[in-house]
């Protein structure tokens, strides 16, 4: 509903039910339906519920697993996720956590957060409250996996000002990575994407 803020779980459930009904209706007419979603479809609970409902209605369902931006964008920035304690926090979980309705984040290892540029102050506050140091290495990845991708290596406390200096719109999706791996020597060697000729 326009102007009422974030959708409630009821709104989301109703939307999911509407989409599912439309898919089943199209399938009942003998049409083939393709549902395109970004990233890995089964990381979205609504898509899983939708696919299950279509299967219960006795229609075939094929799933093509995708690659989630939560792992793809850090890899485009040369950040290796292997061999580290890694916590991945999607946008919905991030919003719950910074609003005080979720959980603390890991105070060690690598934390990767998908959020919006305008929420970085709250993200930093929550990370510090979870036990991270304000001067810990952090990376702000803007325009991830596009030819405009830029990775800023700063400290956790510098993230909000870095976004402001980069003139990011508040609603701009960003990925942040917090932890020592951001400054690992191999990261420079793994800067395979932004170092391409004619990049940007």
Task: Provide a role label for each language-model segment.
Residues 1-3, 13, 17-22, 71-74, ...:
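Short, charged, surface-exposed secondary-structure boundary motifs
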Residues 1-64, 163, 169-174:
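Class I S-adenosyl-L-methionine
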Residues 4-6, 21-27, 71-81, 111:
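Short charge-dense sequence patches
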Residues 5-12, 58-62, 81-88, 131-140:
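Short hydrophobic/aromatic-enriched beta-strand-loop microsegments
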Residues 9, 22, 28-34, 46, ...:
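A contiguous loop/helix-start segment that scaffolds small-molecule binding in enzyme catalytic cores
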Residues 38-108, 152-153:
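Class I SAM-dependent methyltransferase SAM-binding "motif I" and its flanking Rossmann-like core
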